[in-house]
C-alpha cells in the first residue's frame, strides 16, 4: 500500500524560518533524485509520523509537492529522519525519489516468532542479525521478514539463505551469515568432592557460655 504525503517547496533555510515551520507543525526536509535534483521542502510532522508508525520506515510514499502554484507528484522513500534527542519529535527528514521500475536497496528488520525447542532443553536462543540489506522494486519492500524459530534445537542455526523472502526480493548479505542460533546453556559448575578422610567444613562459630 502506498502512503500519501503533501509537501511544500521552500527556498528559505534560515533558523527563524525553520522555527516558524515547527510552530505550524511542519518540519524542514529534502527530497532528491534524478527527476527532482535536490529540492528543499516542508512536510507535516504529524502526517509523516503516522506513516512511519503505520507502514514503517520503508513505506513507499506518493508525495505531492506544491511549488509556484503547481503540484508535482513523485514516488519517494524515507532515507533518513532526525529527532529531538530529548523529546524524540521529528525535526528533519530526507526523502529519495524513486522509479517504480527500478530496483532499490532497503534495510528490513527481522522479526522472530515461536518458541525454540532447544530452549526447553536448556539452550539459549541468540539473535545475531536483526536487520538485513535487501534489493527489490520500491513497491515490493517488505515491512519485515518473519522467521519461525520453533523447530530450532541446540546447535541449530538459521542463516540468511534460509530466510523466507517474498518473490522478487533478494538479500544482499552473505548467504551463510547466521541470523539466529540456539547454543547450549552454561551449566552450573559442580562443587569439588571432599577428599577421603577430610574434616567437614566448619560451621558457624558458637558463642561460649
UniProtKB/Swiss-Prot annotation:
GO terms for molecular function: 5S rRNA binding; structural constituent of ribosome. Residues 184-209 have a biased composition (Low complexity). InterPro entries: Rbsml_bL25/Gln-tRNA_synth_N, Ribosomal_bL25/Gln-tRNA_synth, Ribosomal_bL25_b-dom, Ribosomal_bL25_C, Ribosomal_bL25_long, Ribosomal_L25_dom, Ribosomal_uL5_bac-type. GO terms for cellular component: cytosolic large ribosomal subunit. Keywords: Ribonucleoprotein, Ribosomal protein, RNA-binding, rRNA-binding. GO terms for biological process: translation. It comes from the Bacteria. This is one of the proteins that binds to the 5S RNA in the ribosome where it forms part of the central protuberance. HAMAP family: Ribosomal_bL25_CTC. Belongs to the bacterial ribosomal protein bL25 family. CTC subfamily. Part of the 50S ribosomal subunit; part of the 5S rRNA/L5/L18/L25 subcomplex. Contacts the 5S rRNA. Binds to the 5S rRNA independently of L5 and L18. This is Large ribosomal subunit protein bL25. It comes from Pelotomaculum thermopropionicum (strain DSM 13744 / JCM 10971 / SI).
